[in-house]
Amino acid sequence: MAAPLFDCLIVGGGPAGLAAALGLCRAIRTAVVFDSKSYRNPTEHMHNVSTWDHANPHDYRLAARKELTEGRYNTVTLADVALRKIWKLDSGEFEATDAVGKVWKGRKLILATGVKDEIPELPGYADCWPKSIYHCLFCHGFEERGAPSVGVLAIGPVANPKPAEHLSRLAHNLAKTVTIYTNGNEELAAQLRPSIEKDQWLTLDNRVIKQLHKTDGIPVRVELDDGTTKEEGFLVHAMKTTPRLDFEHNLNLELSAQGTEFVASPPFSETTTPGCFATGDCGMAIKAASMSMSNGSLAAVGVVSQLAFDEKAK
C-alpha cells in the first residue's frame, strides 16, 4: 500500500514545530509532526513566553498537542517516533522513513529539529550544564537575581571581547559583581582591560580553570590552577551549537558562516533546498522558545503559500 501524501512533513515537536503545525491547521492543510521526544535543554521551566512564563516545557507541549488534535482541528497527525531517513524525490516530494520502518510522504518539509550543544572540554562543565550555566539571561537568571557574584566563561564562542563584555554587562543586572574568566587567554585579557577597567563591579581573572564543581543548589565552585576556588551564583556561557539532523538525508542544506544554523531565507525560512524549510533553533541565530514559535508560524505561511501556487501550476 502506497504511503499517504501529506501537504507537509514537520520534523520536531518543540515550540517551532508545534507552531508550524497550528498554522497549517488554520489553512486546512494536512501535516504529520514527528517527535522523537528528545529535546535540547532539559530545563524544568520555560521563560519569556507570555502566559507560559516559568511553566514546565512538558506542560506547554502537552497543551499545544491537545490543541492540534483534540479541539477544532483534524488535519494534523502526531507521530511520536524518530526518523531514520528523509529523501527528496525526483518528483520534488519528500519521503521519510521512521524508526520502525513506516514510510511517510509530504509535498513540503519543515525541519524544526533544534540544535546540538557542543560541550566544552572543561572538567566539570557537563555536570553543571544547564542547571548552573546559563546560555541566555532572558531565559535564565531572574530567579537567582541579587547574587553576590556571578561568572562569565570567556571560552569558545565567548572568547572574544564583544560577547564577553556584552554578557558581563547583562549579568550585572542580576548580580552585585561579575568575574570574567578568560581561562589563561592573555590576548583576550589584554583586549578586554581598556574597555572594563573603570567598572568597579567587574573583575577580570586570567588564571586557568582547573575544574568546575556543582553544588547541591544552583551555585558553582570555580577551581583555578593555583588551587584557589570561588563560588559563583551561576555562570554565563554560550557554547557552540550545530543543527540537529539525526537521520540519513540527501537535502544538501547549506550552513551559516558560523555553522550554528542552516541558511534559511527570511521571513519564511526556506532553505537552499526548494520546498524545505528550517525553523526554530536549527534555522535562527538567536535561539529562544518565543522566537521559535514566531518563526514556526512564518514557516507555515511559506509552506501554505507555496502549496497554493503549486496547485495553480497544475
Swiss-Prot record:
InterPro entries: FAD/NAD-bd_sf, FAD/NAD-binding_dom, Ferredoxin-NADP_redctase_2. Its cofactor is FAD. The keyword RNA-binding does not apply. It holds the Pfam family Pyr_redox_2. Keywords: Disulfide bond, FAD, Flavoprotein, Oxidoreductase. Transmembrane segments: none annotated. Disulfide bonds join 136-139. Pathway: Mycotoxin biosynthesis. Binds 1 FAD per subunit. GO terms for molecular function: oxidoreductase activity. SUPFAM superfamilies: FAD/NAD(P)-binding domain. Its EC number is 1.8.1.-. One of its GO terms (biological process) is cellular response to toxic substance. It comes from the Eukaryota. FAD binds at residues 13-16, 35-40, 47, 112, 281, 288-289. Belongs to the class-II pyridine nucleotide-disulfide oxidoreductase family. Thioredoxin reductase; part of the gene cluster that mediates the biosynthesis of aspirochlorine (or antibiotic A30641), an unusual halogenated spiro compound with distinctive antifungal properties due to selective inhibition of protein biosynthesis, and which is also active against bacteria, viruses, and murine tumor cells. The non-ribosomal peptide synthetase (NRPS) aclP is responsible the formation of the diketopiperazine (DKP) core from the condensation of 2 phenylalanine residues. Homodimer. PANTHER family: THIOREDOXIN REDUCTASE 1-RELATED-RELATED. This is Thioredoxin reductase aclD.
